[in-house]
Amino acid sequence: MWGRTARRRCPRELRRGREALLVLLALLALAGLGSVLRAQRGAGAGAAEPGPPRTPRPGRREPVMPRPPVPANALGARGEAVRLQLQGEELRLQEESVRLHQINIYLSDRISLHRRLPERWNPLCKEKKYDYDNLPRTSVIIAFYNEAWSTLLRTVYSVLETSPDILLEEVILVDDYSDREHLKERLANELSGLPKVRLIRANKREGLVRARLLGASAARGDVLTFLDCHCECHEGWLEPLLQRIHEEESAVVCPVIDVIDWNTFEYLGNSGEPQIGGFDWRLVFTWHTVPERERIRMQSPVDVIRSPTMAGGLFAVSKKYFEYLGSYDTGMEVWGGENLEFSFRIWQCGGVLETHPCSHVGHVFPKQAPYSRNKALANSVRAAEVWMDEFKELYYHRNPRARLEPFGDVTERKQLRDKLQCKDFKWFLETVYPELHVPEDRPGFFGMLQNKGLTDYCFDYNPPDENQIVGHQVILYLCHGMGQNQFFEYTSQKEIRYNTHQPEGCIAVEAGMDTLIMHLCEETAPENQKFILQEDGSLFHEQSKKCVQAARKESSDSFVPLLRDCTNSDHQKWFFKERML
């Protein structure tokens, strides 16, 4: 009986249901139109400018946008180097673009925004399988200030054309108060036609840290993925980052950063073992090979690699965990130093910082920083004051100006450290970064190494390439008291260490020579690196049985330290001075 009645009434009820559904859909459409109009009226400085609404579609494991075909003979179509043979006005325009952006934008404008990069990952990465339906969705946040059109748009298209639709919640561009005309209405119009893209404009210049926080506060994704504004994403870059955060929410994961040449736009990525981040005692970020202890821990060449620090421009983090950790230090200005501060905080407060070898993103490293980093010193001081405990003195010894730098109030950041019950910096050095040599800095045995006879002259070492510190001669130069290239340490192993940089250098005397040359320090000091700083100030080289003397360089007005037979001359007397009086 129940069944027959139900069958007879079904068509009528179905019609009524359909009519009600149509009315409901119409009301929802009107409400949606009203909200869109309100959003458009309210858009302005500081407001988000939304792209078109997402529409469901089949095959959501495919990228958000298909990559349009690029002719194989197009400039740089597969990431190869391009060298234009220019003359006259064209050459002038190219040089002007480099002067303005520190990147060859003249060339960038002639390379497709949709070019395909060559594969630069370990072949084992292709075999990885992902549970797309259960991975978290991400908001990709790209902050920019006066960025060139082609590098910015190539970054956006690269994200959309390589990110699975099901995993990408949105792309948020944060305009940090740019004043270039192409980044105003023209950019808004371009982005309005792209799916899942939003534009947020700051009301004033915020700097990288606070601009990224504007994007983070507006983000709807479970994971925040930060990218710089001149990047290109490799196929399969996103899944490994999200998979790792799905496995471990307290993991902050970086892609392998592949170099894109600023002048030729050649993609220089490689599929070999990536490097990890470190720092030197000036609090400057450095790259290092993966230590043997980490290789032993890894079970596969495509496992995540633990890294003491990160470069800072490109990483993914759970939004909840980012907020739990205290996001960024908003007392930091513009950019510089925030990457080390965040790295210390991740490790010391219970997280883990990793690089995933299956995630590759190309990055254009400018010829030099296009904007001032005059706030970077204060940012580094904030990091040292909050996280480094007594080891901050090693930083101040090598950078005396930092002691005098105003750095603002760090009370809240220290309270955050207490609240999260974070570990001390000694734990970080012993557990996370045992490869970093911790200087002794014994009183009276570090600083400027000054000569008594040649008044106001100090040991000085300034290699032409900061990335290749060995093999050059130590000279004498007027003492400046700023640390850096005039900072040396005399150790209990009888070494004279140049340890403002990584890797550290030790002064050596090569066979048959009388000059002082910089070599790499070794675990046990070899004989040609051993000196005795005697009570009278003589600097005695044990192997040669000679003393270091301040001498005039042949056919020159400059001075150098040379080995000579020992005498009682003041030109053979040396003393350390921590800072200028």
UniProtKB/Swiss-Prot annotation:
Bilayer topology: Single-pass type II membrane protein
Outcome reported for the amino acid change (mutating residue 303 to N): In CRCS1; germline mutation; reduction of activity
Effect of residue 479 to F: In CRCS1; somatic mutation; loss of activity
Region (Catalytic subdomain A) location: 135-244
Domain (Ricin B-type lectin) ranges: 445-577
Keyword Secreted listed: no
Disordered: annotated segments: 43-67
Principal subcellular localisation of the protein: Golgi
Effect listed in the UniProt record for changing residue 373 to H: In CRCS1; germline mutation; partial loss of activity
InterPro entries given in the database record: GalNAc-T, Glyco_trans_2-like, Nucleotide-diphossugar_trans, Ricin_B-like_lectins, Ricin_B_lectin
Chain segments annotated as transmembrane: 20-37
Lumenal side stretches: 38-581
PROSITE patterns for this protein: RICIN_B_LECTIN
Residue spans, topological domain Cytoplasmic: 1-19
Annotated binding of substrate, by residue: 176, 205, 335, 371
Domain of life: Eukaryota
Pathway where it operates: Protein modification; protein glycosylation
Entry similarity comment: Belongs to the glycosyltransferase 2 family. GalNAc-T subfamily.
PANTHER family xrefs: N-ACETYLGALACTOSAMINYLTRANSFERASE, POLYPEPTIDE N-ACETYLGALACTOSAMINYLTRANSFERASE 12
Disease implication from the record: Colorectal cancer 1: A complex disease characterized by malignant lesions arising from the inner wall of the large intestine (the colon) and the rectum. Genetic alterations are often associated with progression from premalignant lesion (adenoma) to invasive adenocarcinoma. Risk factors for cancer of the colon and rectum include colon polyps, long-standing ulcerative colitis, and genetic family history.
Entry note about domains: There are two conserved domains in the glycosyltransferase region: the N-terminal domain (domain A, also called GT1 motif), which is probably involved in manganese coordination and substrate binding and the C-terminal domain (domain B, also called Gal/GalNAc-T motif), which is probably involved in catalytic reaction and UDP-Gal binding.
Designated name of the protein: Polypeptide N-acetylgalactosaminyltransferase 12
Source organism of this protein record: Homo sapiens (Human)
Gene: GALNT12
